[in-house]
Amino acid sequence: KTQGAINVTCFGAFLVAQEASKRMLKRKSGSIFFTGASASVKGFANSSVFAMGKFGLRGLAQSLARELHPQNIHIGHFIIDGAIGREPFGTYETINPDPIAKTYLEFHNQDKSAWSWEIELRTSVEKF
């Protein structure tokens, strides 16, 4: 069970990044995005396996950013701190997927003079 969770939350991302970066390096451009969770930066009781994978994913993204940013490959890690869904307007209990997608696109289009490698997204009512 533990190995399967690590494979899903971390190792699969490594394999995808490995293959995608080969192609992007040939083109000398591209973006690779990883979706994390609040467990990427803090552990919770009864979620150690999930945290292991998400911490690993964040470390992978950070390492790849340092390795590939100078080669014009933009690496992004997105911490989604909350449930994703479409709540009625104004309730802010879940993170609407449309603004998430907009944030990913804006990240992809960042000016090269001001690239970031990580963004946290949460609702305005989420405690952190």
PLM regions and their residue ranges:
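Short-chain dehydrogenase/reductase
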Residues: 6, 10, 46-55, 93-95
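Short, well-ordered secondary-structure micro-motifs
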Residues: 17-18, 44-46, 88-89
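Catalytic Tyr-X3-Lys loop
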Residues: 1-14, 33, 57
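C-terminal helical subdomain
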Residues: 70-128
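Catalytic loop of short-chain dehydrogenase/reductase
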Residues: 25, 31-56, 62, 66-69, ...
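Structural signature of the Rossmann-like NAD(P)-dependent dehydrogenase/reductase core
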Residues: 9, 31-37, 74-77
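Amphipathic alpha-helical dimer-interface segment in Rossmann-like NAD(P)H-dependent oxidoreductases
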Residues: 8-26
